[in-house]
Amino acid sequence: MSKRVVITGAGVVHSLGTELDEFWENIKAGKSGISKIENFDASDFPSQIGAELKDFDPGEYIDRKEAKRLALYSQYAIVAAMKALENADLEIND
């Protein structure tokens, strides 16, 4: 059985950009989002490189108090989902 899927919006939270246009331009330009890890001391790990988000600020999408309680990867997921809703011009009402 096949099911149809409709993609109505996209949101991105990536080391190459947190806005779709910026992300896409960096992809097209062949830029790498990989660099030396700076968010923590990685000297005890076999590799000290990774794809970190620089200057990530979830404040536009998540209350600061709530963000402090959430793991960073959860913040990334929430922000990406909210950006996808915006991109799709979808509004969620209670």
Predicted regions and their residues:
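Conserved "HGTGT" condensation-loop signature of ketosynthase/thiolase-family condensing enzymes
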Residues: 1-94
